Amino acid sequence: MMINIPRGTQDILPAETAKWRYVESKLHNIAANYNYKEIRTPMFESTDLFARGVGGSTDIVQKEMYTFKDKGDRSLTLRPEGTAAVVRSYIENKMNGDANQPVKLYYNGPMFRYERKQKGRYRQFVQFGVEAIGSENPAIDAEVIHMVYNIYKSFGLKHIKIVLNSIGDMDSREEYKQALIEHFEPHINNFCNDCKNRLHTNPMRILDCKVDHEQPTVKTAPKITEYLNDYSKNYYEEVKQYLDLLNIPYIEDASLVRGLDYYTHTAFEVMSEAEGFGAITTLCGGGRYNGLLEMLDGPKETGIGFALSIERLLLAIEAEDIQLDVEESVDIFVVTMPETVKEAVKIVAELRNAGIRCDMDYLGRKMKGQMKQADRIHATYTVVLGSNEIETNKIQIKAMQTGESETIKLQDIASYIKGE
């Protein structure tokens, strides 16, 4: 029986990997423009990292993690998100002692969640994210949101919106939590079992429940902005002032709460409004986390970051019918005769060593078939290598797009292609 790909995963084939490389390269360059440095963490971590860092009451920890025991009977989990692992690395490697504060990091790699498969959502997916750790300053919150805005604009996306909210500090959230309990408790029997279980542990999760988000009592629930203390209000106002200064458009939504327990103060999402994008409109989410490092037994440092889905970014680009300049061509295809194959192998190797992208026939095709192959792989030039060309040390190089040919020396192929 044929073995198929696991459910909820995908093969990214050569026709698509060019787009992925283009997108990821641009993301790396944008992060570098903001002085963020790349960090790479393991794809699996101690399960306790996510239970404590992400939050035991979240859907991720309760339902979506891929957890297993290793041969040493240790509980390990394939990472479902990037922030907790980056913060763990920051603490473990004592980056808070670095004079270059805040520490600005970015990551790019696969994450794993056991979710129901649908368009734009996979069980293995790729996230690009940034974390700025060591500064509690509204200006760096604005910097992170500015980077997000520039990322989507750099791909030519027009139908996006930034949704912004503050979920306050821990004191504000505690007061808000009590207000939510009082609001939902008389109606809790109308809610799903998850919401019932979360009423007294984390009632904010009820607000973004995937089952009950249309409940009337959810829509009439008190807003976090009504419970912000003076510090939280002032912090939020300063963030908005910086965003206005940077001409970044945003929409305030007091019902926005992020699905992870570690968020405080600034919370934001980027949504696609493009027709045909699909039911899942969130492209990116992020926010500030002022207590996460202490929750993981780290120093009293604060951070802010975001994570975006590469898959959903590509879907948004497709939905807006944006063509990426990613056509990959071969510089030259060497057409061979049976008697010149060995010489062609040598010439092709020399061209590759000179930095020329080239290929040749390995199936013994006739000349016509080789020319068709050159066309299929979008070769810029072709040369036909026969015994006469080897004897005279001269060859005709043909531009495939125009059909024009020019006679040059064999040893000059590389410099001709480079325009030297």
From Swiss-Prot:
It is found in: Cytoplasm. It holds the Pfam family tRNA-synt_His. The keyword Cell division does not apply. It catalyses: tRNA(His) + L-histidine + ATP = L-histidyl-tRNA(His) + AMP + diphosphate + H(+). Signal peptide: none annotated. GO terms for molecular function: ATP binding; catalytic activity, acting on a protein; histidine-tRNA ligase activity; transferase activity. GO terms for cellular component: cytoplasm. Its EC number is 6.1.1.21. Keywords: Aminoacyl-tRNA synthetase, ATP-binding, Cytoplasm, Ligase, Nucleotide-binding, Protein biosynthesis. GO terms for biological process: histidyl-tRNA aminoacylation. Belongs to the class-II aminoacyl-tRNA synthetase family. Homodimer. HAMAP family: His_tRNA_synth. This is Histidine--tRNA ligase. It comes from Macrococcus caseolyticus (strain JCSC5402). The lineage of its organism: Bacteria, Bacillati, Bacillota, Bacilli, Bacillales.
